[in-house]
Structure formats: C-alpha cells, structure tokens
Swiss-Prot record:
The keyword GTP-binding applies. Residues 50-351 are annotated as: Disordered. Residues 64-95 have a biased composition (Pro residues). GO terms for molecular function: GTP binding; GTPase activity; translation initiation factor activity. This is Translation initiation factor IF-2. One of its GO terms (cellular component) is cytosol. Residues 96-107, 121-136, 235-254 have a biased composition (Low complexity). InterPro entries: EF-G-like_DII, IF2_II, IF2_N, P-loop_NTPase, Small_GTP-bd, T_Tr_GTP-bd_dom, TF_IF2_bacterial-like, TIF_IF2. Its main location: cytoplasm.
C-alpha cells in the first residue's frame, strides 16, 4: 500500500495538520512536516486514536446525515441461503447495516447521538469476542451507529483517499438494501464511516449489501469459524496484505459464480453471492439483475470464475481482485527487451560497430569529434573511456593509441588521418584540389624551370666563399662582390650550350633549414652541392651533410674546394667519399666531382655546368606558370619597420603583388615583393625566390604557401591549420620512441628497426661502439641501423636527424648544450649518455631483447661558465664562474666540459662561495667561486655542469 502524507490524512480526518503532528509525537512517531509521509501501521494507529481522543467531534460534520443525497432504496434481496453455500465472489464488510424495515432506507437524523453512546461500550464484549486475540491498540475502535446509514450514502470528495480502490467514484453494484431478519446488535468490529482508509470507498454503503460485525444468518456469529475457511477475525493482517483495486463487475452484469478458496462461496442464480467475510463480516448479497456481491473479509476469496486458494486481496473487508499494477506477461517483457539497446561498459548506451566499420578522425581529435562521427553522446564515451583506464574530458585532445583502444572496445576501426590527407581535406573544403590541378595539366601547359640547388658542407671548407664566387658570376645582377641583402636564396644566370640558363641557390648554413624542410616534407631541393676541402678531406660535418642529402634522395655534385692550396689532395677526397657510396665518374661511378677554387674563382663555370648537366640528365624540371602560385617558405623573420618578412620559393604558378596568400598558419595580402638584391618585383615565376611583405605573422621554415581566392578564405584556412596543429601538439604526449617504447613496440610487432645516432669524444671510441653494436646477435626479426655517427658534442643537427628518422641518440663522453637539450626535450628525442662502452652495448642489447630493467635518471641542475681560474696552494684551483642556467648547489655531482667534450666526470662541488661567503647554492645570473676538490684541470671557457642521479621506474 502506498504511503500517505500528513496533510492529506489531516484533511481526511477534518483536523488541521498541527493536530495530527502533535498526535504523532504522542504516539512516538516523530515527523518533520505536514508534507512527510507515514507508514500504513502508523496511519491505522492514528485513525484508531483520533476518535477515542476527540470523541468524534472532529468527524461529526462529515458524518452528518444528508437526506438530499440519500441513495435509492435497494430492492429486496432473496432469502439468505445457508452459509456453507456462499459464492466465490467476496463480500466486503461495509458500514453497519440498518436493521429497520426494508421500506425505510433513510432514517431520521435525530437518533445517531443516543444510539452511539449506547453502542460504544458493547462493541468489544458482545460482538467481537475474538478481538481478544489481537494485539492491543492505542484505543478501542468506535462502533458505528445504525441510524447513521443515511449519512454513509454521501459521495466522498474525489482524490482525498489514496487507499481507496476507486478515487472519488461510488462502487458499482447498487447500494446496500435493508437486511432481513430484524435488528442486530451493533459491534465494534466495523470501522467508522469515512475513517477507514482500507475500505473500498469512503463514507458510503458497499455495493450489493453490507456485512457487519453482527451474527451472520444461518451462522453462529462473528466469533465462530467461517464456513469454508479456518481463519477467524482475531489476527490483524500486515500492511503488506493491502489489496489493489476491486475486481467487481459493472452494474447490471451477472456475476460469475465459482468455487473460491478459504472464505469464498459459490455464486447463486442470477446474482452471485459475495465471499464470506473475515473479522465477523457477514456475506454480502448480490442484487437482482446480476449485481456482484460484496468482497470477502481477511481471508478473501479468489477472483470470480476462478478456483484455487483465496488471495490476500480481500484484507480488511476489501474485495479481492487483480492489483492496480498488473504484472507484465512474458511476451510483453520480451518485446521490451528486444527494443532496448544493449548497454555498454558502465551501463551507458552507445552505438556499436560491427568490427569492420572504419571511422576516420584527424590528429589531436577530441571525444566530441569522435562522438559526432558515430552519432553518440560524448558523455557516454567519457564513461566508456574511464572504464578502460583512461581519464579524459569531452574537449580534450587524445592521441591515436587512445582512440584505437576506444574503437576496439566499441567495434570500430580507427583510421588517423595523415597530415597530408588532413591538408588535402582542409583545402578540399574550400574547393581547392592541388592533385586535380596537377592532373589536369597537359604537356603544353608545362614549361622548363630552373633547378633549385642547395650548397652544403663543412663550415671551414669554403662554402660561403664559394657562394660568393657563384654570386659574382651573375652578370644580370650587374654587381660583383658580396651579397647586398642576403635572404637565404638567390638566382643566377649562366650560359650553357649557347643558352641563358637560370639556377636558383639556397643558402642553408649549417644545413639546419634543409633538415627542417625535409622533416616537414618540403623537399624543394633538386640538387645538392657537397663542398669538401682538398686539404682537410672528409670531415664529420661533411658526412652529416651527406647523410641528409642521401636521406632526401637528392642527386649530389661534389665540389672539391681549395685545390690551389698547398697540400691539397683531390684524389684523397674521391677515395674517402667512395666509402659513403659516392663513386666518382673517374672510378666508374655516376657522381660528378669538380675541382674548384673559390678564392681564385677557378672551376666555377665547370661547377655550374655540372649542375645543369645533372639536372638535365636525372631530373625533369617543368612547371606550369599560368595558374595561381604554389610554393614553400624558405625562411622568415620579423622586421621592425616592415613587419613579417617571408622568403618564399615559387614551385608552380605565378605570384603577383596583390594576391591573397596563406603560408602555414600565416596569411595576408602581398603588399610588395623583392629579389635578393632588394629590387622590387611585380611577379615571380616557378623556381624564383622572393621576399614577401604583408603577412600577419611569421611562417615557419618549410611551410607551404598558396594563393587563396580572397582574404576571407585565406584567413579561414590559416585558422583551421592553427587549430589542427594546436590539437595535434596537445595530443602528441612525447610519442617519439625511446628504448622502453621500442621494447613494447617490438613485442607488439610494430617496429622491426632501431635507428641510432652515435656521437663520441674520439673517433676510436665511436668506431668501437659502432662495431660492437652491429655485431649484436638479436635475430633476423630485428634490424639495428646506425644512421649517423660522428665525433664531437651533440648538436642541433643530430637532434633534427633523430627527429626525422625516429632515432635514439647515444652520446659517449659528450653532452649537448642547453639549447640542443631543450630542442631534444621539445621534439621528444631520447638521448642516452654513457661513459663506459659496455653499458651502452648492454642497454641496446637488452632493449632489443626486451629485458630492460629499472634505470637511474640524471636530472640536470645547472651550468656555470668558467671566467677565470684562481690558483690557491691550500684549496687548489678555484673556478671563478658565472651561472648560465639553473643553479649550482654545493655537494651536487658535477662534470667539466671543454668544447662539448667531457674532460672531468664523477666530480662534486666541494666548495661554493659568493663574495667571500660560503653559500649552499647560487642561482642563474650570479657569479661565484667553485671548487672541485682535487680536480685542477680548469681553463677559461670550460663549462661546469651539475646534476643529480635519481632512480626511475621503467614503464611496464
């Protein structure tokens, strides 16, 4: 049975809520407010205690007789058959029945008061002897008066009683008529009219007759056993036995007879008899015309027309029947189950794939983007990801591994869009298709373009002087000597086979821009000139430049410089380069070697001719100038007077002043163009390097540029590129490979080659380390590749090369400077430092075999540069230093570097002073005196590096 609120019960009892709350407190039930709910036993106790305390004053008004609303007299009922033949239709025990003549259903309103006073003391002893077996209640139940029958015929206010079987409507089956057999003594077993919450209807007679607590016809009274059942009216049912809505028939319909269980009877002819009532309730009588009989008592009968045990639906005089909420059939439950979606992890419902559904997402996408692809709720994906061990927000950028795990759980195949495809889709959204443009071009549209040449080599081998010598041959420029305005790229004209040919040169000192462009996929170089000094031969940076060019698959022309210098040996250079797969034509190879002297200007024409011959023989250099310009940014800088200045190389089309361009994340309109001499240009054809003014920001080296239809389109493309790069950066999470990552990837079959970059302090150590690593027996499944080795400190070029080829840098007694270390940390390149060759070999071998153990991590504290060395007979040499980065802490481990080579290791800061005061640490920018104990090999310019060694758990 449902709970009832205090204010509803107060309105039903005719008192205010405060009175009910006070009564509840007296009964030991502490309720907070009038809106609180109370249980059914408490309601019953409250109803029993209220009439006893108030003497019916509170309920006198509702019980007042209303002759105007009196029901019609019920027709005479047939003589009552023996009790043993009671029908299965249960008869509810209603209000006390009037025992007057049948023709007087409405009695005078005067008798209720005196008869009530006379009947109250007789109820427990005379009519309810079986009530002694019931547990004691707070107060005796008041006996209903016989003269109040007319008052019971009023209709209750709709919706007031939550326990009534029919809210606000009279029960069908007609009103109870006068009972034959004369008056019967009143009993206390019947509830007070309008106060019983368990009656089928409040304040009105029960349909089909009423059962009272008096003796039943043909029986021995309420105290005796009921026919057909063994229950007696002594034990009160529990609140869980409260019934639902009565299952009586509609008025005028014949009641179906049937054999009931305990307390039930069988139906009579024409109109079924009600079931025998518990608690002394007399069986109801069916009215003529098939009106159903009243419901049964405590042991109420089963539903009419159905045999079997009597249910608990007839508790407290309520007719037995089907509950209000019918139980669903198996078919209905099955249909609901089939219509439901199968819940995913955590009880959330998300669309699931069939294991082959491909979902393409961009780099750095968020859960919201993935939810849009599969039409799911992003919050549900957060829950699924949480159960997979990953915590992420809806808008957080995720890496590819997280999306793959999520897709595998939901039945989707995740495909991460490559940067090239992402760029293609981005431009396609603006109706720009570069591939379609290239495919639509015919041979008639293509014209020859100048080759783009990059000059590389050792910085001391005359590369800059060679560029100046080539620059001086530019007769069109009309100047001889140095470069007026060096922009990193320029174009010269030479005469080749009686034709004027142009050659574009890119100046990449340190070949940093070349590596950056190759890392971003901007391979704009057609030919590389490798400059080697004839006296020095092949140097470490020469090999480094050679590795860069070979990795980019660029034809190489070797320029042997300084041939006029004493001790020059060009043949030695050709022999040395043969070891690096550069075989000269004189030795039967295909690489052109040209002897030049940049100082004297000899061999320059032969070098340019060799470049043009290589371009004509090995390359097809053609482009379409009759379209919008496409190209790449070579370099850019921010000028105070002119703003962002970008040097761009046009690869196809023609760039004109006034075009709207977008270069990477920068965009703008071309306000002016200049050549390498500072002259204004109105247009730039393919392979022409120019300086462009008018961009909103500075593009990066290697960013591609194109001409957009208008400024608005250029701005939108730049904004979308910026958003995509920012999301990809957030999702990157240092995904560069390390030794631990390689071990895990090797177990999953994702990596079969380990790339290494070896750097050492001496060539012998590097060669020994390389030979030992290449001799490792790790099986045929794994390949160890050393892409570069050299002597000297770890440089920015080493980091760039490792970034491109996803390699690991191994430093043997060498360290990077602060700028290179920051670059490696930013790019996620793993750099390992060793001082014992066997430790390096063991780590690499264990990585290949998947047997890495926990390691110790070295954390750099700071560096200091030695400005002056003070010699002391007592303390040894003291390094007067200035802290360049971090801090210098007394007692910390230290090493001494000279020209990026470790000359002293396993040292410690023995003493630290500042202005003659002993201090524990000195921070960045301050000067101090540093003592390294017994180590005295200090010189001006040395770098003292301090660090801590911490134990680091390897990723499992």
């Amino acid at each position: 049975m449902a709970k009832v609120r205090v204010h509803e019960l107060a309105r039903e009892l005719g008192v205010d809520s405060k009175t009910v709350l006070a009564k509840l407190n007296e009964l030991g039930e502490f309720v907070k407010s009038a809106s609180s709910t109370i249980e059914a036993p408490v309601v019953r106790r409250l109803r029993e205690s209220f009439p006893a305390d108030s003497g019916g004053a509170a309920n006198g008004a509702p019980a007042a007789p209303k002759p105007a609303r009196a029901p019609k007299p019920a027709p005479k009922a047939a003589p009552a058959p023996p009790v043993e033949e009671a029908p299965a239709e249960p008869a509810p025990p209603a209000a006390p029945e009037v025992v007057a003549a049948p023709e007087a259903p409405v009695a005078a309103p005067e008798p209720p008061a005196p008869s009530r006073e006379a009947e109250v003391p007789e109820a427990p002893a005379a009519e309810r002897p079986a009530a002694q077996a019931r547990p004691a209640t707070p107060g005796p139940r008041p006996a209903p008066r016989a003269a109040e029958k007319p008052a019971d015929t009023r209709t209750p206010r709709p919706g007031n009683n939550p326990f009534a079987s029919s809210q606000g409507m009279p029960r069908p089956g007609g009103q109870g008529g006068p009972r034959p057999g004369g008056p019967r003594p009143s009993g206390g077993g019947g509830p007070r009219p309008g106060n019983n919450p368990f009656a089928p209807s409040q304040g009105m007679p029960r349909p089909g007759g009423s059962g009272a607590a008096g003796p039943r016809p043909g029986g021995t009274g309420a105290a005796g056993p009921r026919p057909g059942g063994s229950g007696q009216g002594g034990s009160r049912p529990s609140p869980g036995m409260m019934p639902g809505r009565s299952a009586v028939g509609r008025p005028g319909a014949p009641a179906r007879g049937g054999s009931g269980g305990p307390g039930g009877g069988r139906g009579g002819p024409g109109g079924g008899r009600g079931g025998g009532g518990g608690f002394g309730g007399a069986p109801g009588r069916g009215g003529p015309g098939g009106a159903p009989g009243g419901g049964g008592g405590f042991s109420g009968g089963g539903r009419s027309g159905r045999g079997g045990r009597g249910g608990t639906q007839g508790a407290f005089g309520r007719a037995g029947g089907k509950p209000v909420r019918a139980r669903k059939s198996r078919r209905a439950k099955r249909q609901e189950f089939e219509q439901m979606s199968a819940p995913s992890i955590g009880g959330v419902q998300v669309p699931r794939g069939d294991g082959t559904t491909v979902v393409r997402i961009r780099r750095g996408a968020s859960l919201s983007d993935f939810a849009d692809r599969i039409d799911a709720n992003p919050a549900s994906l957060v829950t699924v990801l949480f159960h997979l061990g990953e915590m992420a927000t809806v808008t957080q950028a995720l890496d590819a591994g997280t999306f793959e795990a999520l897709g595998a759980e939901l039945g989707y195949v995740i495909e991460i869009v490559s940067p090239e495809d992402e760029e293609r889709e981005l431009l396609g959204s603006f109706d720009i298709d570069l591939d379609a443009e290239a495919a639509a071009e015919s041979d008639e549209d293509l014209e020859a373009r100048p080759p783009v040449v990059t000059v590389m080599g050792h910085v001391d081998h005359g590369k800059t002087r060679l560029l100046d010598a080539i620059r001086s041959t530019d007769v069109v420029a009309g100047e001889a000597g140095g470069i007026t305005q060096h922009i990193g790229a320029y174009q010269v004209h030479v005469t080749h086979e009686d034709a004027d040919r142009a050659v574009t040169f890119l100046d990449t000192p340190g070949h940093e821009a070349f590596t950056a462009m190759r890392a971003r996929g901007a391979d704009v170089t057609d030919i590389a000139i490798l400059v080697v000094a004839a006296d020095d031969g092949v140097m470490p940076q020469t090999i480094e430049a050679l590795n860069h060019a070979q990795a980019a698959n660029v034809p190489i022309v070797v320029a042997v410089n300084k041939v006029d210098k004493e001790g020059a040996n060009p043949d030695k250079v050709m022999q040395q380069l043969t070891e690096y797969n550069l075989v000269a034509e004189a030795y039967g190879g295909d690489t052109m070697f040209v002897n030049v002297s940049a100082k004297n200007g000899t061999g320059i024409d032969e070098l340019l001719e060799a470049v043009l011959l290589t371009a004509d023989a090995a390359l097809d250099l053609r482009a379409n100038p009759n379209k919008d310009a496409r190209g790449v940014a070579i370099e850019a800088n921010l000028d105070k007077g002119r703003g962002a200045v970008a040097t761009v190389l046009v690869q196809s089309g023609t760039l004109t002043v006034g075009d709207s361009i977008v270069a990477g994340t920068a965009y703008g309109r071309v306000r002016a163009m200049f050549d390498e001499n500072g002259d204004n240009l109105s247009e730039a054809t393919p392979s022409r390097p120019v300086q462009v003014l008018g961009l909103t920001s500075v593009p990066r080296a290697g960013d591609s540029f194109l001409v957009a239809p208008d400024d608005r389109t250029a701005r939108q493309i730049a904004d979308k590129r910026d958003a995509a790069e920012r999301a990809a950066t957030l999702a990157k999470r240092r995904k560069r490979i390390s030794l631990e990552d390689f071990t895990q990837a090797l177990e999953q079959g994702k990596v079969s080659t380990l790339n290494l970059v070896l750097k050492g302090d001496v060539s012998g150590a590097v060669e020994a380390l390389e030979d030992a690593l290449l001799q490792l027996d790790v099986g045929a499944e794994v390949d160890l590749r050393i892409i570069h080795r050299g002597v000297g400190g770890i440089t920015q070029n080493d980091v760039n090369l490792a970034t491109v080829d996803n390699a690991i840098i191994i430093g043997f007694n060498v360290r990077p400077d602060v700028r290179v270390a920051e670059l490696a940390d930013r790019e996620g390149v793993d750099i390992r430092y060793y001082s014992v060759i066997y430790a390096a070999i063991e780590d690499v071998e264990n990585s290949l075999k998947g047997m890495l153990k926990p390691e110790f991590e070295e954390v750099q504290l700071g560096t200091a540069e030695v400005l002056q060395v003070f010699r002391s007979s007592k303390f040894g040499n003291i390094a007067g230093s200035r802290v360049r980065s971090g801090l210098i802490r007394r007692g910390a481990s230290a090493r001494v570097l000279r020209d990026s080579v470790v000359i002293g290791d396993n040292l410690s800061i023995g003493s630290l002073r500042r202005e003659k005061d002993d201090v524990t640490e000195v921070r960045d920018g301050f000067e101090c005196g540093i003592g390294l104990g017994s180590f005295n090999d200090l010189r001006e310019g040395d770098v003292i590096e301090t660090f801590e060694v911490r134990e680091k758990e390897r990723a499992s």
